[in-house]
C-alpha cells in the first residue's frame, strides 16, 4: 500500500518565537596560523539561512503549507536578509522591529565539512513589550490549523503562557519546542517536543525505555499537556499520550552529518501534518521520516515533499515497512535466503493499545521477522459492525509500521487472511486470544508446509472494544 502524504497545501500554520539568521563561511584550510595554534580558513563561499523559529517556518513552507512567522528583530542588515530569504520561499513574515536590539545572528566557520567555530551576535529580548505579538496571534487564529511556539530562550516567548491561552480559547493546537528546565511555562500546551537531553534535565536520567514512559506520563499530568514527543537521536522518537500505549519509532537516518535545526524540522512537519487534518500518530510518522532526511544534510536545512515521500517509501524500498502483497512476497523470499525465521500474525488493530504492543513484541521474539496482516476497512466493517473501524486502514498500517517489533505490514480484503497466509507460508503463524490452533485461519496451510501455529495470550485488561465503550461513556457523562 502506498502511503499518501498529507494535503499540506490546505494547511495553515503560524510560528512564533526566537528568529535568527544563520551565516556560514566556507573555505579550505591547509595551514596553522603563526599567531595562535588555530587553522587558517581561506573563505571562498558565504551563505545566509533563516534559523531558529525562522527555520521552523521554512520547513513548513518547503512542504507546500502556508507559513506565517512572528518574531522580534532589530532594524539592521540581518533583519533585511531574513525577510528577503523568507519571502523567497513563501513565508509570510510579520516581524516586530526593536530598534534597541540587533537581530540575533550566528556565524559558523566550516572547512572540509567540519564546523571549526561559531560566533554569536545577540542581546536578549527580555523586557520587550509582548502586546504586538499577541495582536498578531489573535488576528491569525481563525485561519490557522496549528500554532508553533519555537523557544530558544532569547526572550521572544517571555509571555508564552498568554500565547498558549489565546490559542486554547480559539481551539487551535499549540506545539512547543521547549528550552530550559522550567516546563511550568508551557502548562496547557497540546504537545511538547523536547529532545532526550532536555527531557532528562527536567525528569532526571532515564536508564530504560520504561522510565522514559513513566516519567513522561507524569510530566504530561503535572503540566496538563495533551501529549509529549521525546526525540531520542539514534533511538528515534517516543510519543506519549494519556490513555494510549506509548508509540516508539526507530530512527530512519542513514547517515548523520549535522543535527543543526533537526528539531525545527520535526516540529515543522508535525504542525503542518496536524494542520492538514491528519492524526498526531501520522504526524509523528512523517516527522520521524523528515528528521532522518535533514540530519543527512550539512547546516540548517529543510525537507521537500519529494524527499519526504522518498523517505516514507524508503523502508519498503529497502525491504521493510508498509507493503503490497507482491512486495511482501519478495521481502520474505529475501529473508529466507538470509536464513531468517518469519513470524506472521493478523488482526484489525483499530485503536492500538498496550495489549497490542506487548502481544506484537512477544510475537517478534519468536522469530527474526514479524509480518502483521491487517483487515481492510470493508473487512473490518463486516467483522465488527458499521461503526468500525474507528481509524481507517492507512492510519492503522502507518502506526503498526512504526513499531519496533513490526517488520512488515500488509492488508487483506477478505474476511480472513487465509489466502494471504497460504501465499506467504510463514515459518510460524501466531494469533492472540483463546483460539485453538486448528481454528486459526491459515493453520492448515502452514502445517502442510512444515510450519508451526501458536496461540499467544493477550495482556489482561486491554481491549479496543472497552476503550471505545469508555470513550462513549465519558462523552455521555
Swiss-Prot record:
**Function recorded in the entry:** Catalyzes the ADP transfer from ATP to D-glycero-beta-D-manno-heptose 1-phosphate, yielding ADP-D-glycero-beta-D-manno-heptose.
The EC number(s) given in the record are 2.7.1.167, 2.7.7.70
Q: What is this protein called?
A: Bifunctional protein HldE
- In which residues is ATP bound? 195-198
Region Ribokinase: start and end of each range? 1-318
Per the UniProt entry, what are the Gene Ontology biological process annotations, in alphabetical order?
A: ADP-L-glycero-beta-D-manno-heptose biosynthetic process; lipopolysaccharide core region biosynthetic process
Q: Does the keyword Kinase apply?
A: yes
The subunit field of the Swiss-Prot or TrEMBL record says: Homodimer.
* Classification via InterPro entries: Bifunc_HldE, Carboh/pur_kinase_PfkB_CS, Cyt_trans-like, PfkB_dom, RfaE_dom_I, RfaE_dom_II, Ribokinase-like, Rossmann-like_a/b/a_fold
UniProt lists the family membership as follows: In the N-terminal section; belongs to the carbohydrate kinase PfkB family. In the C-terminal section; belongs to the cytidylyltransferase family.
Q: Name one GO molecular function term.
A: phosphotransferase activity, alcohol group as acceptor
Catalyses: D-glycero-beta-D-manno-heptose 7-phosphate + ATP = D-glycero-beta-D-manno-heptose 1,7-bisphosphate + ADP + H(+); D-glycero-beta-D-manno-heptose 1-phosphate + ATP + H(+) = ADP-D-glycero-beta-D-manno-heptose + diphosphate
Q: Where is this region: Cytidylyltransferase?
A: 344-477
Recorded source organism is Shigella flexneri
Main EC class of this protein? transferase
Q: Which Gene3D superfamilies match?
A: 3.40.1190.20, HUPs (3.40.50.620)
Q: Any one cellular component term from GO for this entry? A: cytosol
Which residues are annotated as active site? 264
Amino acid at each position: 500500500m502506498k502511503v499518501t502524504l498529507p494535503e499540506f497545501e490546505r494547511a495553515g500554520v503560524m510560528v512564533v518565537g526566537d528568529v535568527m539568521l544563520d551565516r556560514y563561511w566556507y573555505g579550505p584550510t591547509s595551514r596553522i596560523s603563526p599567531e595562535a595554534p588555530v587553522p587558517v580558513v581561506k573563505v571562498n563561499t558565504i551563505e545566509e539561512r533563516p534559523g531558529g523559529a525562522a527555520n521552523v517556518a521554512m520547513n513548513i513552507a518547503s512542504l507546500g503549507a502556508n507559513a506565517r512567522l512572528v518574531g522580534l528583530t532589530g532594524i539592521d542588515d540581518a533583519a533585511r536578509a531574513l525577510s528577503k530569504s523568507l519571502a523567497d520561499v513563501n513565508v509570510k513574515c510579520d516581524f516586530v522591529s526593536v530598534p534597541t536590539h540587533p537581530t540575533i545572528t550566528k556565524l559558523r566557520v566550516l572547512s572540509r565539512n567540519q564546523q571549526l567555530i561559531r560566533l554569536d551576535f545577540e542581546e536578549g529580548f527580555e523586557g520587550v513589550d509582548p502586546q504586538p505579538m499577541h495582536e498578531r496571534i489573535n488576528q491569525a487564529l481563525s485561519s490557522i490549523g496549528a500554532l508553533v511556539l519555537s523557544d530558544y530562550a532569547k526572550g521572544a516567548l517571555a509571555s508564552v503562557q498568554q500565547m498558549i491561552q489565546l490559542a486554547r480559547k480559539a481551539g487551535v493546537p499549540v506545539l512547543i519546542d521547549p528550552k530550559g528546565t522550567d516546563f511550568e511555562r508551557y502548562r496547557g500546551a497540546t504537545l511538547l517536543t523536547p529532545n532526550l537531553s532536555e527531557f532528562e534535565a527536567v525528569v532526571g536520567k532515564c536508564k530504560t525505555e520504561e522510565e522514559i514512559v513513566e516519567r513522561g506520563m507524569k510530566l504530561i499530568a503535572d503540566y496538563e499537556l495533551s501529549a509529549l514527543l521525546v526525540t531520542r537521536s539514534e533511538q528515534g522518537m517516543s510519543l506519549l499520550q494519556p490513555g494510549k500505549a506509548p508509540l516508539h519509532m526507530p530512527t530512519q537516518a542513514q547517515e548523520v552529518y549535522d543535527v543543526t535545526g533537526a528539531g525545527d524540522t520535526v516540529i515543522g512537519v508535525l504542525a503542518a501534518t496536524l494542520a492538514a487534518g491528519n492524526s498526531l500518530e501520522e504526524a509523528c510518522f512523517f516527522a520521524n521520516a523528515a528528521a532522518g532526511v535533514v540530519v543527512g544534510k550539512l547546516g540548517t536545512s529543510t525537507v521537500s515533499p519529494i524527499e519526504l515521500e522518498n523517505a516514507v517509501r524508503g523502508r519498503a524500498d529497502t525491504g521493510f515497512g508498509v507493503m503490497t502483497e507482491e512486495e511482501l512476497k519478495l521481502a520474505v523470499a529475501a529473508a529466507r535466503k538470509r536464513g531468517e525465521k518469519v513470524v506472521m500474525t493478523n488482526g484489525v488493530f483499530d485503536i492500538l493499545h498496550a495489549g497490542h504492543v506487548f502481544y506484537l513484541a512477544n510475537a517478534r521474539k519468536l522469530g527474526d521477522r514479524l509480518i502483521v496482516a491487517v483487515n481492510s476497512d470493508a473487512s473490518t466493517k463486516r467483522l465488527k459492525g458499521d461503526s468500525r473501524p474507528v481509524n481507517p486502514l492507512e492510519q492503522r498500517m502507518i502506526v503498526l509500521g512504526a513499531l519496533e517489533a513490526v517488520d512488515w505490514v500488509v492488508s487483506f480484503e477478505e474476511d480472513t487472511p487465509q489466502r494471504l497466509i497460504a501465499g506467504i507460508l510463514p515459518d510460524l503463524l501466531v494469533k492472540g486470544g483463546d483460539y485453538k490452533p486448528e481454528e486459526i485461519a491459515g493453520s492448515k496451510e502452514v502445517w502442510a508446509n512444515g510450519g508451526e501455529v501458536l496461540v499467544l495470550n493477550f495482556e489482561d485488561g486491554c481491549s479496543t472494544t472497552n476503550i471505545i465503550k469508555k470513550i462513549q461513556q465519558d462523552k455521555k457523562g
